[in-house]
């Protein structure tokens, strides 16, 4: 089974609030370890993407730090709810990625 057919699948990396490809446009295959079949790809990120991710996190941190515990808990709860709403598809993706039937 190919994970590319799942709505949650992205072949990009999430940096600074955006889904982006690696500057090199290179990718790394994600293979089912049981069958060795390619089930997807991920960007082959390098120094540029790592630097951008670090700089973006450093820029975002003061705003996050200034939020109250209640505000942060609301954001984390929304993330938790999204995971729960999509738990079936996430479980299927993880199962395929681990080579299980």
Where are the regions a protein language model picked out?
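Glycine-rich loop-to-alpha-helix module at the N-terminal edge of alpha/beta enzyme cores
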Residues: 37-101
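Terminal low-complexity tails and localization/encapsulation signals of metabolic enzymes
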Residues: 1-41, 74, 78
